[in-house]
Amino acid sequence: RRPDMTAARPALFLDRDGVINVDRNYIYRVEDFAWIEGAQDVIRRFNDMGWWVFVVTNQSGIARGLYTEEQMQALHDWMGEELAKSGARIDRIYHCPFHEDGTIARYTKDSFDRKPKPGMLIRAMTDFPVIKERSFMIGDKQADIEAASAAGVRGFLFSGGNLASFTDWVLADMGEGR
C-alpha cells in the first residue's frame, strides 16, 4: 500500500551501486545485478515505518556511452518488480546521467545533480514532503556523504556487509530505534 503522498515523513536516501547492489562497474543489465545482503529487507522495513525511500545514483556510464537511459530504466523497472514481490517499493529513483568527461555530447557537462553536489536529494525534498531533520543518506563513497551534508541531511558511509545490520546501527545512532 502506498502512503499518503501529502503527509510529511522522514526519508531514507540510498545510493544504488555498492549499497543496494554489488558494485561491479557500470551495472545496467539484470544479469549483472546482485542485491546487497539485507537491501530488500531495509527498503521494506522503511516502507513499513512510513518513511520515503529514494535512490540517488550517479550514472556516468550513460555520459560515457556505455549504456543508455532506456537500458538503465529497464533495470530500475526490474528492481521495482523484484521489490514488489517482497512487499517493498522505492518511492522514486533519481539518477544523474551527466559527466564532464562524457563521450555523448548531450550528457557531457557538469551537473548540480552529480554527487557530491546535492541536486538529486534537493529535488526529492522538493518533489515530496520530507522531514529533513530525521532523514539520512547511506552511501558507499565520500561523494554520497558530501551530497547528503550539502542537502542538509546526515550521511552514513556503508563499507559493505549486511545493509539491514548497518541500518539498525544508523537508526540507533539517530535515536530512531525500533
For the regions a protein language model found, what residue spans apply to each?
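Active-site flanking residues adjacent to catalytic metal/cofactor-binding acidic residues
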Residues: 14-16, 57, 138-140
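Metal-dependent phosphoesterase signature
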Residues: 20-37, 62-71, 85-88, 98, ...
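Short, flexible segments with low predicted structural confidence
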Residues: 17-18, 95, 120
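Asp-based, Mg2+/Mn2+-dependent phosphohydrolase catalytic module
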Residues: 2, 7, 70-92, 100-137, ...
